[in-house]
Amino acid sequence: MSGQLRDTTGFLYEIGLLKRYKRTGWSQVGVPLPESIADHSYRASVIASVLAAMEGADPQRAAFLALWHDSQETRITDIPHLTKNYVSAAGNEQVTGDQVAGLPAAVAEMISAAVAEYEAARTREARCARDADKLDCLLQAREYAEQGHSNVQPWIDSSLAALTTASARQIAHEAIAQNSLDWLERAKRAAARAQ
């Protein structure tokens, strides 16, 4: 087996850790089975594409940036904000560089460029992806609040304050105003009318 093929396969196994690693901040407030990092990255990618379409940016690029935004957490895990005051971790671009070392050049460049663009936050797509990260956190906090976890308001407040695009702020305010399952009731009524 070639070294690049071995390293690429190993990288794909490494990325699988994101399905098992949990978002640690939720555990701090008593959520017994918090979402995984992969759960978060998936919905953030969907949100990024929606925001980009609403903002006139490239939905595919925004979703792609969001897809890679937490890939470094296979090595540094999801470090809670309080913990960041006491420990330091390598920057995301450095971690990504270590992760992609040994991969085919085209693959390494694709991933490194996506992470660099996301971190720089200069493109509309990167801003949409970064807002998607925060908006997913807000949505998740609202869902956990509805399940009885009352200590999540700081996540809602900080996520809302961090949003930079008009579309993300509008969706956030709507998310705060409605129940997370209101869509289901609307869908049931629409299905009943269609029959």
Predicted regions and their residues:
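Active-site helical microenvironments for divalent-metal-assisted chemistry
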Residues: 1-195
